[in-house]
Regions:
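Repetitive helical segments and hydrophobic/amphipathic motifs
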Residues: 14-15
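Core of compact, soluble alpha-helical bundle domains
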Residues: 24-152
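Bacterial N-terminal signal peptides that target proteins for export
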Residues: 1-11
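C-terminal motif of bacterial Sec signal peptides marking the signal peptidase cleavage site
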Residues: 18-22
Length: 152
């Protein structure tokens, strides 16, 4: 019986020691915990604002779609796009503008118009050397809005 108690205490102390030793070791963070938000990988609000500024310039120069933006309050439009991208990518912004459906009602936006606008956005992303992975993630976030934008 005495031998059993010694053995029991030996095992108990060993388990505690191993447990403490394993707690003291640095555990490797998981890949998910390490991965920064898309907002951060895009460079934050300043970088998003720069891309949106270029995107709006691209749209203004694009004869396929620029007429659709006649009479639009461009500074307000830019702010809405920045906030939408910022919030959608995990940033601290809050999108407070009209819904996509309400914003595009009556504009008669076609699939060709939508495609042209996406091309203008991709051109802006490319100009700022946004990596393909981040571009794909952003377009995947914005893509579902197509149903509320395209009306014909």
């Amino acid at each position: 019986m005495k031998g059993f108690k010694k053995f029991f205490w030996f095992i108990a102390v060993s388990v505690c020691f191993i447990g403490l030793a394993s707690c003291a070791q640095k555990s490797e963070p998981t890949a998910m915990a390490e991965k920064a938000s898309l907002y951060d990988r895009l460079g934050g609000k300043d970088a998003i604002t720069a891309v949106v500024d270029q995107f709006v310039a691209n749209v203004a120069a694009d004869p396929r779609v620029n007429a659709m933006f006649a009479g639009v309050d461009i500074p307000h439009f830019k702010q809405c796009v920045v906030d939408q991208i910022c919030e959608g990518t995990g940033g601290p912004c809050k999108y407070m503008c009209r819904t996509m459906k309400d914003s595009h009602a009556g504009l008669g936006c076609t699939q060709d118009n939508f495609n042209a606008i996406v091309e203008d956005l991709v051109a802006a992303l490319n100009q700022f050397n946004v990596p393909q992975q981040e571009q794909s993630e952003l377009l995947a976030i914005l893509g579902p809005l197509q149903a509320d934008i395209v009306q014909q």
